[in-house]
Amino acid sequence: MIVMTNSAAPHLLPVFARSDLGFERGEGCWLIATNGDRYLDFTSGVAVNALGHAHPALVKALQEQATKLWHMSNLFQSPDGEKLATRLCNESFADFVFFCNSGAEALEGVIKLVRHHHFSKGHPERYRIITFEGAFHGRTLATLAATGSAKYLEGFGPPMDGFDQVPHGDIEAVKKAIGPQTAGILIEPIQGEGGVRSATPAFLKALRQLCDEKGLLLAFDEVQTGMGRTGDLFAHRRTGVTPDVMSLAKALGGGFPIGAILATADAAAGMGPGSHGSTFGGNPLAIAAANAVLDVMLKPGFFDHVQKMSLLLKQKLASVIDRHGDVVSEVRGEGLLIGIKAVVPSGDLVAALRNEKLLTVGAGDNVVRFLPPLIVTEAEIEDSVGRLERACAAISSSQTKRAAS
């Protein structure tokens, strides 16, 4: 039995419910604990370690950059940063990129950019942004307000003004929420923390049409879905819908902290010197890591592999549901952003899987996320499903014993 505790880290602010597990190194899809036990990592640092642990390309890039330059500030030119920005623009709708350090920071910048867009066009009254129930956009004050979840907002004073939350997937509710102060719409193509809930292509297309009709900006939060997680570089590319603004982070650096805001020239109108900034954003180490990630992901066949592993994992998980319907009931998600709807409390399933040395992460709607590195092999998929089978069997056995007692 694994206990959630903070006793091993008495001087760390106790805001995380940490398990008593500690890891000393990682190899590909595996984490090696301090006692030598090997765990199959299907958390990927919550969709961060897209290339697994200690990927040779990332190690090489960071080792080489570490001997050259770590930090110089954004007062000077950054050739490698410009290279990364150009590559991201070439692969997307964007004309401009701003680099920062995290997903929440990227979303803060998106919110500022959406508001400033209308200010620059003579409409400072347009500052409100429509968001969706079940969303998660970060833990800063602005992104908490955009998220709108009471459990995250409690204790931090009045929520920041400027966000109108509507039911997910309800286009009529979106239409009713649009007013003279509305500046844009912010949505995750797939809600990760919210329970791996996908926005349908039809819904995203309807949002795009509304934004075009009303002069709003459409912003996609691709912090979790971006950088290959759904089987393409960006999740929205598989829907046929193009945003005006997008946030990236998590897998962009493959484990090294970096975030980004991508925007069209029109969306970024008015964003000149002094309108935004970051001390560490786009530092050379982070840029080197992100360029190395793109080097790997843009090789022919990379996303085909993700899609192939996705299909295999979904098929195997469906067969587990057939045999253990008392524990799990549904598979959802795209690419290797997979959610399993649990019948038992999701925390119990996460714990049972951890006891089988398979690491997963919970989400809303009683869902357990399977987020393997995108380099996962067929053998590792098979291995993970075997561990899930054993975890489900253990839970079923425990339920039977409780019922008999």
From Swiss-Prot:
One of its GO terms (molecular function) is N2-acetyl-L-ornithine:2-oxoglutarate 5-aminotransferase activity. The keyword Amino-acid biosynthesis applies. Its EC number is 2.6.1.11. Pyridoxal 5'-phosphate binds at G103, A104, F136, D221, E222, V223, Q224, T279. GO terms for cellular component: cytoplasm. It catalyses: N(2)-acetyl-L-ornithine + 2-oxoglutarate = N-acetyl-L-glutamate 5-semialdehyde + L-glutamate. It is an enzyme of class 2 (transferase). The modification N6-(pyridoxal phosphate)lysine is found at K250. GO terms for biological process: L-arginine biosynthetic process. Pfam families: Aminotran_3. Pathway: Amino-acid biosynthesis; L-arginine biosynthesis; N(2)-acetyl-L-ornithine from L-glutamate: step 4/4. Its cofactor is pyridoxal 5'-phosphate. Keywords: Amino-acid biosynthesis, Aminotransferase, Arginine biosynthesis, Cytoplasm, Pyridoxal phosphate, Transferase. N(2)-acetyl-L-ornithine binds at R139, S278. The keyword Aminoacyl-tRNA synthetase does not apply. InterPro entries: AcOrn/SuccOrn_fam (IPR004636), Aminotrans_3 (IPR005814), Aminotrans_3_PPA_site (IPR049704), Class-III_PLP-dep_AT (IPR050103), PyrdxlP-dep_Trfase (IPR015424), PyrdxlP-dep_Trfase_major (IPR015421), PyrdxlP-dep_Trfase_small (IPR015422). Homodimer. May also have succinyldiaminopimelate aminotransferase activity, thus carrying out the corresponding step in lysine biosynthesis. Belongs to the class-III pyridoxal-phosphate-dependent aminotransferase family. ArgD subfamily. This is Acetylornithine aminotransferase 1. It comes from Bradyrhizobium diazoefficiens (strain JCM 10833 / BCRC 13528 / IAM 13628 / NBRC 14792 / USDA 110). The lineage of its organism: Bacteria, Pseudomonadati, Pseudomonadota, Alphaproteobacteria, Hyphomicrobiales. The gene is argD1.
